Amino acid sequence: MGLDPQVKENRLKLAGIVLENYYRKTTAAARINRLDMPVFHNSGDIPRGRRDVLQYNSHLELESLPTGGWGYDHFPISAKYVSQLDLDYLGMTGKFHTTWGEFGGYKHPNALRYECSAMLAYGARCSIGDQLPPLGRLDESTYQIIGTAYAEVEAKESWCRNVRNIADIGLLSSAAVTGRHPQHNEADTGAGRILLEGHFLFDVLDAEMDFSKYKVLILPDEIRISESLKSKLQQYLADGGKLLLTGESGLDISQDRFVLDIGADNLGEDEFAPNYVLPSESLRPAYVNSPMVMYYASRKIKTTNGRSLGEIYHPYFNRSFAHYCSHQHTPAKPTPSGFDSGVIHGNILYLAHPVFMNYFAYGAAACREYIVNAINLLLSHDISLRSNLPSIARTTLMQQPRENRYILHLLYGPTVTVGGPVDNLPKTIRKPKEIQIIESLPALSNVTVSLKISHPIRRAMLEPQGREIPFVVRDNRVELTIDTFSCHQMVVLS
């Protein structure tokens, strides 16, 4: 082939050729005797934007064991991408306390109840993985635990078939655009967590998908713009769409300039990391009126024809061997740097920090509230769902067109971190890691929900209980209260 193995690009090219050869030959072999044989090639994650491999799969299986390294946010983000593809998909969790190969390990039944409920809430079919021991006998305890979860699935299935996700926001995947596909892309995962914890209705997109149906399009942190993407974004804006750009997103793919008019000048990357942000009052967390630390370097912008959304404050110096300060970094100087932390101009809102990567890495509630307030500024009264749910709860809104109804899913399963690495184990044992588990499923009470739905609603039912609940319509919004629920509640609106 004339490829030099010492050149990384050549090695990657050969790897792609070998993988394509594998897909082609193994798929053909599986279908020698049956052309409609279901085939799925598992890789631990569905790579966003890799549409070239979809032709080798009859369906998609979203391997995502929360205790096996994927965590509880991987599956929702993955499901919100594959739901936009023309393939059936199922969630794949495991019965293990940790991960594959853990014979004698049992996940708490409540965890499997929650995980299967989440699969239904995100439009997926359900799969729970096990491994068969050498004697070939199924483990009774395992299947009692699985049976408990599947009994609930069976009771809910009729409200979960042939659904489509309702979304205000399209999250353009950084992994899809940049071609970098780690299991947890920091920008994508950070943005996904913000949207999940803020209870926004959203889809995850690649650059080939239709942007026009979304009220807001988010480009998280590191999406530089090609000519083809620029044309698509310009059309989206011309049709009334709104953009949230952060960090490097919006810059030209080959030059350090913004391809769209964000209402500010770009003066490059700030030399200070961390630095500080004092958002404008409309974006500030309710409990913060001082500059907040942001660990990743921001872009240096100065507002021109846009409206400033806050100010950047610099530290006294970057902490180093030459300049030392305490345990982490120096405080903010008392006066602003002269650079803006964000700007809004027309239908484009830009934040100078890679805020989603920052949230992925540090998870500060103040940072989340800053970003949520920015998204709400764009959505304004067009937001489809408001609620008083805590950030750890999850919600989706599905439509069942054939049944002419909507299904609101509410999920609540608080996680606890357990375990951790130790060194004094026998060499025959795999080293443990910290894992997230669900054990208790406490109830949430007096959950208020306000929905903006385009169709008239005449009835609201709690399912599968079959209990009707009251609601009111005010300012073209359906408002209702769920007295109490645990784990998963469906509210069917027809």
What are these regions (language model features)?
Residues 1:
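Cysteine-cluster motifs in flexible loop/terminal segments that predominantly coordinate metals
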